[in-house]
Amino acid sequence: MKKILLLLLLPIFGFGQVVNTFPWTNDFESFITLQEDPNDNGDWMLKQGPTSSANTGPSGDHTTGNGMYYYVESSYPGYPNQVFTTYTPMFDVSATPGKVLSFWYHMYGTAMGDLEIAIISGGTYTPIDTISGNQGNQWYFAYYPITAVDSFKIAFKATTGSSFT
């Protein structure tokens, strides 16, 4: 049995350089991953298809239903209150008007934890939202205008809930 905290990111990703060509999108079909925090409790993982535990996670990804999605596994030892953080590459958006972060997420399980989304710019970590608890068995679209920064990366910090269900 496991509880899943899921995320399908659309307008981001790739590593090794500063991204300055937009829109920048990824549906994880090319197995492009994000940068994992080496000091937290574990890594986000790629998954295809349904989760193996009843009443947790989606039946498939948002885009095709058969594609890949990024998620946190919270079966033992992934609970309680374990932190999993992943980062996008640095984005240089100084010449880009109308900066926006958008993605699809799925948080289904009775003991679901939290997903914190933050901007890191100039060494400052600024949370922009926290989504908490069981959101039901469906995908949701998140949309955040990004203001007052020209260079940044995004942190996705998942904190597992009180159990794996």
At which residue positions do the language-model features occur?
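Short, intrinsically disordered, charge-balanced linker/junction segments flanking boundaries
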Residues: 15, 64, 161-165
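Extracellular glycan-recognition surfaces and repeat-rich motifs
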Residues: 18-77
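Extracellular beta-strand-rich recognition modules
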Residues: 28, 86-107, 115, 150-160
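Extracellular acidic, Ser/Thr/Pro-rich low-complexity tracts
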Residues: 61, 107-109
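Extracellular beta-rich ligand/substrate-recognition surface
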Residues: 71-84, 132-136
